[in-house]
Amino acid sequence: MMDKRTLLKLVVLAFGASILLLVFGYTSGPKIVDEHTIRYVLEQEPSTLDPAKSSTSPEATVQLQLFDGLVRLDDKGEPEAALAKSWTVSDDGTRYTFHLRPNLKWSNGEPLTAHDFEYAWKRTLDPSTGADSAYMLYVLKNGEAFNNEKADRDDVGVEAIDDDTLVVTLEQPTAYFLKLLASHGYYPVNKKVVEANENWANDAETLVSNGPFKLLGWQHNGEMNFVKNEHYWDADEVVTKTMNWPISESQSTRLTLVEGGEADMMVEPPVADQQRLEEAGLLHIGPMLGNYYYLFNVKAEPFTNPDVRKAFSMVIDRKEIVKNIVKGGKEEAYAFVPY
């Protein structure tokens, strides 16, 4: 039998790099639920679960439970086979040929094929989609050109040769391409479902996915409920049967739910409580590759002047912010790429 603590650790791995600060709650008595149920307090209501249109960390966290791509990241952040059982790369590093696992299915039981990937990627790049994640597919041959209406859909470097084979051509060799494939912008979508209802990704009754879980219910701004997807290719390894995720943007409310035994974990506890929680062994600090930043409206005065923008950047005391405000092991950042 798997105890609650072990089960929680497995779920942390499933969430991947989106988790930075987690609070675990351990209670006894009638509030303990089945050990195969996970109760995670989501920090924001998703505006959509459409992989092409989502842009926030909470949306990505939910999608990680509902969708799966050609590859996924292991607990060390390295790509491993997922829907693709294998792949080959051309000598010049610009052409990838992916071979899908046999008998893949959507959560509604319909066959999932390489054509679903081709459709999804080209849909994301289609300017009429208005996809926030389109830029993530600019590594594809003519991906950026198509997104900017300078190339045709058929010019994009992704083609399903048959139901089980997907050929991808890149603009140039891209060492991190396999890691990109694990992100939501590269998830497949069901063409029939998408084209039947433009709001397909905003309701549990219409959302069709392919990941380890299915969306059973979605009470907007209230709670999301998940159930194990029996059609998932790796279903035998999914030990969690159900998940109940209350939604709250309030850090204090999320912490109250966890400490009161109404939830198992949350992300980003209030700064004032972090030391207490860490001393109690309830706070887990893990790595996250990401940035917090401010954006200037460069079309409005005075930020049309680059020197003004530089001046604002220079007077921001990043070390002070990290040490005394955000805390949690974060480091000051001076660029998007920290290495």
Predicted regions and their residues:
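Extracytoplasmic/periplasmic ligand-capture domains
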Residues: 3-28, 101-130, 207, 212-325
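Surface-exposed ligand-recognition segments of extracellular binding domains, strongest
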Residues: 22, 77-105, 118, 135-192
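Ser/Thr/Pro/Gly-rich low-complexity linker/stalk segments immediately outside membranes or between
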Residues: 28-40
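N-terminal lobe/hinge region of extracytoplasmic solute-binding protein
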Residues: 41-91, 122, 208-209
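A structural "hinge/loop" feature
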Residues: 44-61, 83-84, 110, 126, ...
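Short, solvent-exposed loop/turn elements at domain surfaces
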Residues: 46-53, 78-80, 176-179, 224-225, ...
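Gly/Pro-rich hinge or "lid" segments in bacterial periplasmic/extracellular proteins
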Residues: 149, 153-155, 159, 163-164, ...
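Structural transition elements
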Residues: 332-339
